[in-house]
Amino acid sequence: MMRYLYERLKTFRGGANFAMPGHKGRVAFDFDLSDDWTEVTGADNLLNPKDVIASAQEEIAAAYGVDKSVLIPAGSTTGVKLALYLAAEPGDKILIQRNSHLSLFHAAVELGLELVYLPAPVDEATGLFAGVDPADVEDALAADPAIAAVFLTSPDYFGGGLRLKEIADIVHERKKVLIVDEAHGAHWAFTPLAPYSATTCADYTVQSLHKTMAALTGAALLHMNGPVDERKLLKGMGLFLSTSPSYLLMLSSEYAVAAGKAFDWRKLLSYRKHMEESLPTIDVAKERGNLIACADPMKFLFHVPGYRGDEVVSLLAEKGIYLEMGDAYYALAILSPYNSEEDVERLIRGLKALLEREEDMAPPKGAYPKTEAVYSPREAFFMETERLPLRDAKDRVAAENLTPYPPGIPIVTYGERITEEVIRAVEGSKNAIGFEDGKVTVIKSAW
């Protein structure tokens, strides 16, 4: 049998990695395959922890300064579902950002949740989401007291953090629950950005340790503050997690938190400063208005004049330099403690080698089109469907997410109408999941 995946991944060895995972293939873990166990006597059980796993979770909670932490060796996607299961009941309304991760929309299908959208302002200078206005949260909760919880993403994929403490005060004053997808900020609690971490103010915080820290891909955490229904928590873990959770993922989670606490994260600031000073003609996205409280310097989002971002990604990959993502305008490099000075120099040399083109392009006018929800995600998911060419699907209702990946934010989700704006956004994306062979899935017409 040909080992296709293995042979392909071997070609990436020796590259300069500015993508996930945060360990960059360089962490000398102090565990190995001999530690890959299941729930044998003495190894405890994640689905009913009473011994070493319970102790590990207590230690992690103390490191993050939260009341309780749970190991999630199944990615933040599972952490999101578990948090929503704990915070809401079927039929409940959840106030969300439209630029939420795909996992939230999947959770809405599985749990039967109704989604209420916050306004999604866009920064005119960068074309990126401009954050969440605390006043919009207050207005939405006042207008609809039936909303059970607020679900926010902070930091976002590009490293922008929300004004979470202000928002948390508003949410808690109205006796609602605040859930934060902090998948991209598991390291924040150990950096100068600690005051902006959701762990300081959210009821539930979901983190992906592997994105920026020394954990294996799929290692995640769910943090909780305040009272926890232990019976419901165990029930939810049994529902969403495998009965054979990976001990290697859990071991890497322990390792990552310990290493994250010990690392001097300010070291990465010098890398970032050197990159910006060495590349004066590169357009680096920074400020996004006063609704973004802080920006993570580990996320180096930039535009090379004259080039699409996905073009930059491809050209650098030919040189063994791997970026996290590229779209029609931007490219993204993610720094971590395991990038070397030589990595940074290779990236700088690679970008300098790209010849500037005389004709440049304008930043995107808006990150995602405005959409109209016709059905709830769960209703749309189970309706009869058909596949149509994208252009023929105008004004029809989507039965699947159309999602550029990365970052995994749907252009349109289950139950939303496909507009001309949606069509143009999908056409502009080269890697939208759900858009195969030029066709999309829509709810079947009665006519």
Could you say what each language-model-derived stretch is?
Residues 2-8, 27, 63-66, 76-286:
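Conserved PLP-enzyme active-site core in the AAT-like
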Residues 33-78, 99:
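Conserved N-terminal alpha-helix of the aminotransferase class I/II PLP-enzyme fold
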Residues 43, 70-72, 150-153, 332-334:
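Short glycine-rich or small-residue beta-strand-to-loop segments that form or flank ligand, phosphate
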Residues 1-51, 407:
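N-terminal "arm"/small-domain region of PLP-dependent enzymes with the aminotransferase-like
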Residues 432-447:
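Charge-dense polyanion-binding interfaces
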